[in-house]
Amino acid sequence: MQTLSSAPDPAASIAVTILAILLALTGFGLWSAFGPKAKKLTDPWDDHDD
């Protein structure tokens, strides 16, 4: 059992760091897709002339 004075497990620290990065990237993707700047985005398929 770990106490507060013992060093944290390195694998847990790496896992938490990777999880935080993935959550940040997911949040940024959702914000850029549905946030206030999304109105300026265009669909390249709609802009393409057949």
UniProtKB/Swiss-Prot annotation:
It is found in: Cellular thylakoid membrane. GO terms for cellular component: plasma membrane-derived thylakoid membrane. Pfam families: PsbN. InterPro entries: PSII_PsbN. Its main location: membrane. The keyword Zinc-finger does not apply. One of its GO terms (biological process) is photosynthesis. Belongs to the PsbN family. May play a role in photosystem I and II biogenesis. This is Protein PsbN. It comes from Prochlorococcus marinus (strain MIT 9215). The gene is psbN.
